[in-house]
Amino acid sequence: MYEYQEDFIRFALDRGVLRFGRFTLKSGRESPYFFNTGLFNSGTALSKLGRCYVESLVRAQIDFDLVFGPAYKGIPLATAVAMALAETRNRDVPYAFDRKEVKDHGEGGRLVGAPVEGRRAVIVDDVISSGISIREAAELITAEGGTVAAVAIALDRKERGRDEVSAVHEVEQTLGAPVVPIITLDHLETYLADHGGKGDTLDAIRQYRARYGAA
């Protein structure tokens, strides 16, 4: 585990973004942990989050020239990544996002921000559950003449999707592009084991993974 990944887990815990307990997910599964990037809700938090996304993309050697944020949650995430690229890598990368509702006046259309045509986009989101929002974003990008270079997420839960493979793997197969997480469930387990995490919490996560983890 890299230092930035350990820092990210610690920061997520401090902010209450990552919590342990009993949580019912949209899938109906009862999870021993919950991850809510909506609590990265200040300038300092978004700045740190953006830098972590950038670090993961750089280490994965992703070649891209546009950052795309699916509405609504992905919009501040994409903005944070674009700013972090400028601040830490001296790269002035344009960004764009979509509207949930088509605008029929002014500039109109579904997309806001930089032109997508001819660009290699990184789609930025928090996690991948069903993958629907990611696939919709990819369709918008390709319809506008762009391509998807990668998908950047904060956490890969490494859970099964519709089949035995993970929802992340399903997205990779569908888009033909890699999914790059800041951390995975592997990193979280390692962090808890190395930092004296409560034994019952770590056991609960391992039991959950044994039941719902991807093959």
From Swiss-Prot:
One of its GO terms (molecular function) is orotate phosphoribosyltransferase activity. Keywords: Glycosyltransferase, Magnesium, Pyrimidine biosynthesis, Transferase. SUPFAM superfamilies: PRTase-like. GO terms for biological process: 'de novo' pyrimidine nucleobase biosynthetic process; 'de novo' UMP biosynthetic process; pyrimidine ribonucleoside biosynthetic process. It catalyses: orotidine 5'-phosphate + diphosphate = orotate + 5-phospho-alpha-D-ribose 1-diphosphate. One of its GO terms (cellular component) is cytoplasm. Its EC number is 2.4.2.10. It comes from the Bacteria. Pathway: Pyrimidine metabolism; UMP biosynthesis via de novo pathway; UMP from orotate: step 1/2. Its cofactor is Mg(2+). Orotate binds at residues 34-35, 129, 157. The keyword Nucleotide-binding does not apply. The keyword Disulfide bond does not apply. Homodimer. Catalyzes the transfer of a ribosyl phosphate group from 5-phosphoribose 1-diphosphate to orotate, leading to the formation of orotidine monophosphate (OMP). This is Orotate phosphoribosyltransferase. It comes from Halorhodospira halophila (strain DSM 244 / SL1) (Ectothiorhodospira halophila (strain DSM 244 / SL1)). The lineage of its organism: Bacteria, Pseudomonadati, Pseudomonadota, Gammaproteobacteria, Chromatiales.
